[in-house]
Amino acid sequence: MRTVSGFGRQVGKVLSRVRPRRSRPVALVASETSTVERRPLVSDRLGEQRHAGAVLDQVDGTTCGSAVLVALAAWADPAEVNRLETPAGGKSLVGAGFGSRYDARQKQVHGETNRFWPQALGTTPWGAVRWLRDHAPAAGRYRVRLVDDTSAADVAQVIDAVGAALASRPVPLLVGSFVPRHYVLALRADGAGWRVYEPTSGQVRLLDLAVVRERRLAPVLGFDRLHAALLPS
Protein backbone atom coordinates (compact mmCIF):
# COMPACT_ATOMS: atom_id res chain seq x y z
CA MET A 1 0.00 0.00 0.00
CA ARG A 2 1.23 3.48 -0.83
CA THR A 3 2.09 5.88 1.95
CA VAL A 4 0.68 9.39 2.22
CA SER A 5 3.90 10.63 0.65
CA GLY A 6 3.63 8.04 -2.10
CA PHE A 7 0.20 9.37 -3.02
CA GLY A 8 1.64 12.88 -2.91
CA ARG A 9 4.42 11.83 -5.24
CA GLN A 10 1.89 10.45 -7.73
CA VAL A 11 -0.17 13.64 -7.62
CA GLY A 12 2.99 15.71 -8.12
CA LYS A 13 3.95 13.70 -11.19
CA VAL A 14 0.52 14.30 -12.73
CA LEU A 15 0.70 18.02 -12.02
CA SER A 16 4.23 18.25 -13.43
CA ARG A 17 2.95 16.90 -16.74
CA VAL A 18 0.21 19.53 -16.76
CA ARG A 19 2.49 22.35 -15.61
CA PRO A 20 6.13 21.49 -16.33
CA ARG A 21 8.55 23.01 -13.84
CA ARG A 22 11.23 25.29 -15.17
CA SER A 23 14.72 24.06 -14.41
CA ARG A 24 16.61 26.05 -11.81
CA PRO A 25 20.36 26.38 -11.34
CA VAL A 26 21.70 24.25 -8.51
CA ALA A 27 22.93 26.40 -5.63
CA LEU A 28 26.56 25.91 -4.75
CA VAL A 29 27.40 25.18 -1.13
CA ALA A 30 30.34 26.42 0.85
CA SER A 31 32.29 23.21 0.28
CA GLU A 32 32.13 23.85 -3.46
CA THR A 33 33.01 27.54 -3.40
CA SER A 34 35.50 28.02 -0.58
CA THR A 35 37.75 26.29 1.90
CA VAL A 36 35.58 26.32 5.00
CA GLU A 37 37.11 24.79 8.11
CA ARG A 38 34.40 22.37 9.21
CA ARG A 39 33.48 21.91 12.86
CA PRO A 40 30.58 19.47 12.59
CA LEU A 41 28.67 18.47 15.69
CA VAL A 42 27.89 15.06 14.24
CA SER A 43 30.76 13.09 12.74
CA ASP A 44 30.39 10.24 10.27
CA ARG A 45 31.90 7.82 12.79
CA LEU A 46 29.56 4.93 13.58
CA GLY A 47 28.15 4.88 17.09
CA GLU A 48 27.04 7.34 19.73
CA GLN A 49 27.69 11.00 19.01
CA ARG A 50 28.85 13.28 21.82
CA HIS A 51 30.06 16.85 22.05
CA ALA A 52 31.39 18.42 25.22
CA GLY A 53 30.15 15.41 27.16
CA ALA A 54 26.55 15.66 25.90
CA VAL A 55 24.87 12.98 23.79
CA LEU A 56 23.66 14.56 20.55
CA ASP A 57 20.12 13.25 20.68
CA GLN A 58 16.78 14.96 20.20
CA VAL A 59 15.46 16.81 23.22
CA ASP A 60 11.92 15.35 23.04
CA GLY A 61 9.65 13.24 20.88
CA THR A 62 8.84 16.05 18.43
CA THR A 63 12.30 17.51 17.73
CA CYS A 64 13.93 14.91 15.48
CA GLY A 65 13.69 17.39 12.61
CA SER A 66 15.16 20.16 14.74
CA ALA A 67 18.11 17.96 15.78
CA VAL A 68 18.77 17.14 12.13
CA LEU A 69 18.59 20.82 11.13
CA VAL A 70 20.99 21.85 13.91
CA ALA A 71 23.41 19.12 12.81
CA LEU A 72 23.20 20.25 9.19
CA ALA A 73 23.61 23.92 10.11
CA ALA A 74 26.68 23.05 12.20
CA TRP A 75 28.16 21.06 9.31
CA ALA A 76 27.73 24.06 7.01
CA ASP A 77 28.88 26.85 9.30
CA PRO A 78 31.22 26.65 12.33
CA ALA A 79 29.36 29.64 13.78
CA GLU A 80 26.56 27.24 14.75
CA VAL A 81 28.94 25.24 16.95
CA ASN A 82 30.45 28.43 18.36
CA ARG A 83 26.96 29.60 19.33
CA LEU A 84 26.34 26.36 21.22
CA GLU A 85 29.69 26.46 22.98
CA THR A 86 29.42 30.09 24.08
CA PRO A 87 27.15 31.28 26.91
CA ALA A 88 25.22 34.47 26.21
CA GLY A 89 27.58 37.39 26.64
CA GLY A 90 30.51 35.14 27.52
CA LYS A 91 33.51 33.52 25.97
CA SER A 92 33.65 29.98 24.65
CA LEU A 93 33.45 27.45 27.49
CA VAL A 94 33.29 24.04 25.86
CA GLY A 95 31.49 21.65 28.18
CA ALA A 96 30.04 24.31 30.49
CA GLY A 97 26.28 24.07 29.93
CA PHE A 98 26.63 22.84 26.35
CA GLY A 99 23.90 20.22 26.77
CA SER A 100 21.30 22.72 27.97
CA ARG A 101 22.16 25.14 25.15
CA TYR A 102 21.94 22.30 22.63
CA ASP A 103 18.49 21.36 23.92
CA ALA A 104 17.37 24.99 23.89
CA ARG A 105 18.62 25.43 20.35
CA GLN A 106 16.52 22.48 19.18
CA LYS A 107 13.42 24.01 20.75
CA GLN A 108 14.21 27.36 19.15
CA VAL A 109 14.57 25.75 15.72
CA HIS A 110 11.35 23.81 16.32
CA GLY A 111 9.49 27.06 16.85
CA GLU A 112 11.06 28.68 13.79
CA THR A 113 10.11 25.80 11.48
CA ASN A 114 6.49 25.56 12.63
CA ARG A 115 4.97 28.98 12.11
CA PHE A 116 1.62 27.59 10.87
CA TRP A 117 1.93 23.93 11.90
CA PRO A 118 1.21 22.41 15.33
CA GLN A 119 4.52 21.80 17.09
CA ALA A 120 3.14 18.57 18.57
CA LEU A 121 3.13 17.13 15.03
CA GLY A 122 6.84 17.77 14.47
CA THR A 123 8.29 19.55 11.45
CA THR A 124 6.99 19.49 7.90
CA PRO A 125 9.61 18.91 5.19
CA TRP A 126 8.67 22.24 3.60
CA GLY A 127 9.20 23.97 6.92
CA ALA A 128 12.62 22.33 7.17
CA VAL A 129 13.57 23.51 3.68
CA ARG A 130 12.40 27.04 4.47
CA TRP A 131 14.40 27.07 7.72
CA LEU A 132 17.59 26.00 5.94
CA ARG A 133 17.08 28.75 3.36
CA ASP A 134 16.46 31.45 5.97
CA HIS A 135 18.74 30.37 8.82
CA ALA A 136 21.49 28.16 7.34
CA PRO A 137 22.28 29.59 3.88
CA ALA A 138 25.80 28.13 3.97
CA ALA A 139 24.23 24.67 3.64
CA GLY A 140 22.87 25.57 0.21
CA ARG A 141 19.27 25.31 -0.89
CA TYR A 142 17.25 22.12 -0.59
CA ARG A 143 13.95 20.94 -2.02
CA VAL A 144 11.44 18.30 -0.93
CA ARG A 145 11.51 15.12 -2.97
CA LEU A 146 8.60 12.87 -1.99
CA VAL A 147 9.07 9.13 -2.47
CA ASP A 148 6.64 6.46 -3.67
CA ASP A 149 8.32 3.46 -2.09
CA THR A 150 5.92 1.03 -3.77
CA SER A 151 7.63 1.92 -7.07
CA ALA A 152 11.04 0.29 -7.51
CA ALA A 153 11.86 2.85 -10.19
CA ASP A 154 11.03 5.79 -7.93
CA VAL A 155 13.07 4.35 -5.06
CA ALA A 156 16.00 3.75 -7.41
CA GLN A 157 15.82 7.35 -8.61
CA VAL A 158 15.86 8.80 -5.11
CA ILE A 159 18.68 6.47 -4.00
CA ASP A 160 20.76 7.67 -6.95
CA ALA A 161 19.92 11.31 -6.21
CA VAL A 162 20.80 11.01 -2.52
CA GLY A 163 24.03 9.19 -3.37
CA ALA A 164 25.05 11.96 -5.75
CA ALA A 165 24.22 14.67 -3.21
CA LEU A 166 26.21 12.95 -0.45
CA ALA A 167 29.38 13.57 -2.44
CA SER A 168 29.13 17.22 -1.35
CA ARG A 169 26.73 17.57 1.58
CA PRO A 170 24.47 15.73 4.04
CA VAL A 171 20.89 14.87 3.08
CA PRO A 172 17.93 14.89 5.51
CA LEU A 173 15.59 11.92 5.11
CA LEU A 174 12.01 11.53 6.34
CA VAL A 175 10.82 8.04 7.31
CA GLY A 176 7.62 6.70 8.83
CA SER A 177 4.81 4.19 8.55
CA PHE A 178 1.75 5.08 6.47
CA VAL A 179 2.41 8.67 7.51
CA PRO A 180 5.79 10.43 7.92
CA ARG A 181 7.10 10.25 11.49
CA HIS A 182 10.84 10.74 11.86
CA TYR A 183 13.81 12.67 10.44
CA VAL A 184 17.34 11.32 10.09
CA LEU A 185 20.40 12.73 8.35
CA ALA A 186 22.35 10.79 5.71
CA LEU A 187 26.01 11.80 6.11
CA ARG A 188 27.97 9.89 3.49
CA ALA A 189 27.99 6.78 1.36
CA ASP A 190 29.60 3.65 2.80
CA GLY A 191 29.89 0.75 0.37
CA ALA A 192 26.37 -0.44 -0.44
CA GLY A 193 24.81 1.82 2.17
CA TRP A 194 24.77 5.21 3.87
CA ARG A 195 25.99 6.37 7.24
CA VAL A 196 22.96 8.00 8.86
CA TYR A 197 22.57 10.09 12.00
CA GLU A 198 19.54 8.87 13.96
CA PRO A 199 18.59 11.53 16.54
CA THR A 200 16.42 9.42 18.86
CA SER A 201 19.50 7.45 19.91
CA GLY A 202 22.07 10.11 19.09
CA GLN A 203 23.91 7.51 17.02
CA VAL A 204 25.32 7.24 13.51
CA ARG A 205 24.19 3.95 12.01
CA LEU A 206 24.91 2.09 8.80
CA LEU A 207 21.85 1.83 6.55
CA ASP A 208 22.02 -0.90 3.91
CA LEU A 209 20.28 0.32 0.76
CA ALA A 210 18.71 -3.11 0.33
CA VAL A 211 16.41 -2.40 3.29
CA VAL A 212 15.34 0.87 1.68
CA ARG A 213 14.26 -1.02 -1.42
CA GLU A 214 12.54 -3.70 0.70
CA ARG A 215 10.78 -1.20 3.02
CA ARG A 216 12.47 -2.65 6.12
CA LEU A 217 14.18 0.39 7.65
CA ALA A 218 12.74 -0.01 11.17
CA PRO A 219 15.61 -1.99 12.76
CA VAL A 220 17.98 0.86 11.86
CA LEU A 221 15.82 4.00 11.78
CA GLY A 222 12.72 3.09 13.80
CA PHE A 223 10.24 3.11 10.89
CA ASP A 224 10.07 1.01 7.74
CA ARG A 225 9.08 3.43 4.98
CA LEU A 226 11.06 6.17 3.22
CA HIS A 227 8.76 9.17 2.68
CA ALA A 228 11.01 11.96 1.44
CA ALA A 229 14.53 13.22 0.91
CA LEU A 230 15.58 16.85 1.08
CA LEU A 231 17.77 17.16 -1.99
CA PRO A 232 19.97 19.99 -3.26
CA SER A 233 17.95 22.49 -5.24
Label the predicted regions.
Residues L28-V36, A96-L230:
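Conserved active-site-adjacent core of cysteine acyl-enzyme catalytic domains
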